[in-house]
Each structure stands twice: as structure tokens, then as C-alpha cells.
Amino acid sequence: MNSTLRKWFPLVLFAAAPALLFAQEKQAAPKLTNEQMEHFLQTAKIVKIKELSVGVTDSRRANLDDGTLQHSAHVQSIDEHKAKFEGERGTEMNFVDTWMYNIAAYRLAGLLDINDMVPASVERKVDGKPCAVTWWIDDSMMEVDRKKKGLSSPDPDAWNHEMYVVRVFDQLIWNTDRNLQNLLIDPAWHIWMIDHTRAFRLYTSIKEPKDLVMCDRKLLGKLRELDAKSLAALKPYIGNGEIKGLLARRDKIVAFFDNQVKAKGEAAILYDRPAR
């Protein structure tokens, strides 16, 4: 559970057919835009909901139906705020674990043009409580299961390029809970980042500088564009303190990669991640 991201770059052992690796659903969902997924999540009827056996409390899977499309969603209502929290990773002051950060992470991913790696998430009341309702990634396996089975991506370069995005994003949002259950792998071996309820800390430092290795060229450009005005799109799910910390970390991340490019050259540091 506490493995670092650096340990998540396997050598290619073999390429297995996705149909053998993932449990298939009866009918694949049609390709939708993010806006269409958001609308579905906010308006479709919840026909069934149950607690998840994996993960934290206040986490459920709902089956949604709008009369045309049926799809599942991840429903989270956790909203804890503690002055002091004692966890397995030590003591944390000003601890926050909230559904609101899931929506903030999705909106931030949109600003960075990496919302093809963070599933759509919207606010909706479920059983009278405000929740984050997040698009369910069909036919996926968790990173923890991939490691247990000894499976590796058939395209190590594509895998690494997506994992570098994960690293940069987690340092930007100061994610304290990126574990092997919070990364999903779909049948095309694309990585999805989920469950950001313990992110957006107030710190201005970088949590794990060693995790910054390479960066997608477009992502670096989008990082430069972030400012208080654009990040207002994340409110009310994060406040001014979280935005201030995020921008300070952004400055450090951009400066780090700029210095690395000067020292090692663009080819060693920057790459172009293809569209998914």
C-alpha cells in the first residue's frame, strides 16, 4: 500500500490479451464527452447502490439509468476535518478527508488537459447528503492487482509516460493517499487516477521531489498557465489557502523541469504524450 511511484515501472514480462485480464461487463458504455458524462452523473436515476468492500468508509457504487444509458458511479460522502490526525503514515495536522477534493481534482485535470486520466466527478445529493459522484471506469483492474498478478503493459514507453503524469499531478495537489488501490488500469492499459479525498494540502513544498523525473510537454505548458483566476473554477471545493499552496508548488515544479531541461536537454526531460 505504501509503495512509492518509483517502484511502479515494471519491465515488460509479456503482453496479455486485455480480454483475459479484465472482467467484462455485458455491454460497453458508448463513448461520451466529459460534459455528457457530467450531465449523466448529475441527472440519471440511481436504481441501486451498495457499499464497496475495498476502500474507506462512505464509499459506495451506484447503478445509474437515464432511460437510454446504464452506467455505474463511485459515490463518496466522506467529509472529515481534524486538527490532528494519527494515521499509519504518522501525525498530520489540519487533516482533511473530503469528497469535495475529488471534484476539485477533476476540474484541475481539465485545466491541465489531463482529464482523460481523471474520471468525471460532480456534486450530487445522494440519500440527502452532498457527495462526489464519479464516473466508474469499466473493466478496470487496480494497480495492486496488476502487481499481484505480475502483469506488465505491452507498451512500456506509454505506461511510463502516463505514470510521469501521475507523479507530477500528485506533487501538484500534495496527494497524501496515492496507494495501489487508487490507480486503475483499463483494458487498453491506460492509467486512471481516482480518489483524491486526501489531497490539496496547504503546504508550499513538494512532497516527494524524487518523483519528478520527466514531464509531458503539453502538461508543463498548462502548468505555466495556472493562476488564481483560472483556479477559481475549483471553488467552492477548495479555498484560497489550498489555491495558494497549489500555485507555490506549481512554481517549484515548473522551475525544477526548466532547470532539468537546461542541464540535460529537452530530449532527456520532456516528451509528448499521445491523445487517448
Which residue stretches match the model-derived regions?
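Phosphate/dinucleotide-binding and metal-coordinating scaffold of catalytic cores
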Residues: 22-276
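Bacterial N-terminal signal peptides
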Residues: 10-20
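Bacterial N-terminal signal peptides that target proteins for export
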Residues: 1-12
